[in-house]
């Protein structure tokens, strides 16, 4: 971001820009999103958008960063709240969670996944990898406590990156 918002009003403007960007991606597709379309959907002028973001790609990267953080936290919460659940049920729930996320927000994540190769080195990808690794370590440690930490870490890494 060009300028991190400090005041509440500025934070609301940035949130509005990001919400409009998400809607535009779901509505027009990732490659057809433009700053003028974001401005129109958000009700924020193009000039005001450029006070906070250098370009459309920076807006999208910030949106993906935030969505990835929220997705990772939701997955962690789901995995850690269900302490008494069996492994198979947890796997089923995790898969259903993934499908549900894909359907949310008018297919926003489906559209992003089509072009994920362009974002796989982004901060958003790093955030997701960190959360998935932590969930993997938690689950493996819970169901396979006899495995060493290195084994857990390596198996989690292989599964996450497969």
Regions found by a protein language model. Name each.
Residues 69, 73-75, 89-96, 100-107, ...:
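Amphipathic alpha-helical packing segments from all-alpha helical-bundle domains
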Residues 6, 148-160:
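Membrane-interface starts of transmembrane alpha-helices
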Residues 2-6, 53, 80-84, 118-122:
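A short, mixed-charge helix-start or loop-turn motif at secondary-structure junctions
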Residues 12, 16, 24-58, 62:
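Helix-turn-helix
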Residues 17-25, 67, 71, 98:
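Short hydrophobic clusters on alpha-helical segments that form packing/core surfaces
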Residues 1-12, 146-147:
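N-terminal intrinsically disordered/low-complexity leader segments
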